[in-house]
Amino acid sequence: MSKINLFSQIISKLDRPSFNKLVLEKQTDKHSKGYDSWTHLISMLFCQFSGCQSVRDISNGLRSATGNLNHLGVDLAPSKSSISYQNQKRDWTLFQEYYYALLTHMGNLSGKQRTKFRIKSKIFLLDATTISL
């Protein structure tokens, strides 16, 4: 079995057709050259999950994983200026609507998988709270 990192596992759960539909509705990729909305989303998710503090951190982090970007649907790691420009100019409502679409999609998936369970044995809890003296 091949090793897949946590970031690519999370990205694989994203509903790409739903995202592409929103991109066509909003026309956010109309004038983009190489840095499309999907790459923007991947860049911002990478920023959140890796704890990046600056645009330079995002750009350098994605460049260090250049070989793995193809599996995420990203052709080329974005430059600092591209990330900065698209953060200012791209319509943020695309990502807001995609969040709610993804929330609905994932909620429907999890609703079917819920099972009731009962714990039959005693559960012992240990409180590790520190008390200052």
Regions found by a protein language model. Name each.
Residues 1-133:
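Short alpha-helical elements
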